[in-house]
From Swiss-Prot:
GO biological process terms on file: regulation of DNA-templated transcription
Role noted for this protein: Transcriptional regulator involved in the response to aldehyde stress. Binds to the promoter region of the adhA-yraA operon, the yraC and its own promoter region; binding is unchanged in the presence of aldehydes.
Region (Disordered): 120-140
Segments of the chain annotated as binding DNA: 3-22
GO molecular function terms attached to this record: DNA binding; DNA-binding transcription factor activity
Record keywords, A-Z: Activator, Coiled coil, DNA-binding, Stress response, Transcription, Transcription regulation
InterPro entries the record matches: DNA-bd_dom_put_sf, MerR-type_HTH_dom, MerR_fam
Name of the protein described by the UniProt record: HTH-type transcriptional regulator AdhR
Species of origin: Bacillus subtilis (strain 168)
Any Pfam family hit: MerR_1
Taxonomy of the source species: Bacteria, Bacillati, Bacillota, Bacilli, Bacillales
Length: 140
């Protein structure tokens, strides 16, 4: 696949794919004799992995380190596992923060629901002749 096809498949730009390769987020992509990148199935798997990890909030630095270690072979399995475990823990902590924020928002929304119900009850309890501008007699 060429860069335009891969970019379209993943909703990325060609510039982003070039950047991923340049900074080491993905291993170097093979090229045709003409110099055009020729993405194979392994490259596609790397892009899927990087996109998934970036969407989850992993830092570019952590992913570059992971990719670098991967290219060094099986002797780096433990280090790669540690990177992923550290990032997983960071995401768990982030999820806790998000859950707490959602709880606070839910509380505030309930508070506002209560205020809205109070205001509606006040409006319904007013005499029919009274409006926001006073009673009909007061306006004459």
């Amino acid at each position: 696949m060429n860069i335009a096809q891969v970019a379209k498949q993943f909703g990325l730009t060609a510039a982003t794919l070039r950047y991923y390769e340049r900074v080491g987020l993905i291993p170097p992509v093979k090229r045709k004799d003409s110099g055009i990148r020729d993405y194979d199935e392994e490259d596609i798997k790397w892009i899927e992995f990087i996109k998934c990890m970036r969407n989850a909030g992993l830092s570019i630095e952590a992913l570059i380190e992971y990719t670098t270690l991967f290219t060094e072979g099986d002797r780096t399995v433990e280090a790669r596992k540690n990177i992923l475990a550290d990032e997983r823990q960071r995401l768990i902590e982030k999820r806790k923060e998000i859950d707490e924020t959602i709880k606070r928002l839910d509380t505030k929304i309930k508070d506002y629901d209560g205020k809205l119900r109070e205001n509606e009850a006040k409006l319904k309890s007013r005499p029919k002749t009274e409006s926001l501008h006073g009673s009909v007699e007061q306006r004459r």
